[in-house]
Amino acid sequence: DVAPLDRGENVRREICLTLEEMNIRPESSHHEQGPGQNEVDFKHAAPLTAADDVITFKNVVKTVAARNGLYGSFSPKPLADKPGSGMHVNISLARGGRNIFAPGPDGAYSPAMRSFIAGVLARAGEICAFTNPVPGSYARFGSFEAPRYVAWSHQNRSQLIRIPAAPAPEYARIEVRMPDVSCNPYLAFALLLAAGFEGMERKMELAEETPYDLYTANAGALE
C-alpha cells in the first residue's frame, strides 16, 4: 500500500507512542479537514483522569511537534476560512457496572440520558463561558461541523449535542461538541457533569430532536 500524502503521519505516530508510554491510550489518530489539522481520540476514563490526560496530551503534542521542527497550536480558530479545532467530550454514566445511558429493549433513549442532555442544554449558555473562554472560541462556531444553536440530534454533527451510533448498548454515550482545547478541562468536565446531574435530579424534559442540518436551515425552521 502507498502511504497517504500526510506529512503529519509520523508526528502523530510519535505522539501516540509517547502517550502510550505515559499510560494514556489513544484509540485513533488521523488528519482532519484543515491544513495541518490533526485529531487524536483517547480511550474513555473517569473525569479527573480524563482532565489530567488532556493537560498531558497538550504538553506531549507541543514537545513532539517542536522536536520535529513544527509548532503545536490548540487555537480554536487558527485560520479564518478553515475548520476550527474543538474538543468533543463524550459522556456516559454507569451505575452498578451498567451504562444507564443504554437504550431500552425498544431502542428508545433512556430517561437518564434524556434528562442529562436536557440539563446540559439548559445550562449551555452559562457553561460556554468556561468551555469556550477565548475570542477565537466564538469564531469557530457555526461552520465546519461546529455548533451554533442549542440543540441536539442523533448523528447530526451540526448540533451542540450528538448521540453517536453505538455498536452495543454498553457503548451508548452523548457527544458534547461545544468545548475547545483552550478551556480548563477540570472546570469544563465538572460543569458539564453538574448540569447533566441537575437535569437528572429535576427530571427535565428533553425538547424534540432537531434532525436537520442547522448550517443550511432557513430562518423559519429555527423559530
Where are these regions (language model features)?
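Glycine-rich, acidic/polar active-site loops that bind/position phosphate-bearing ligands
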Residues: 1-223
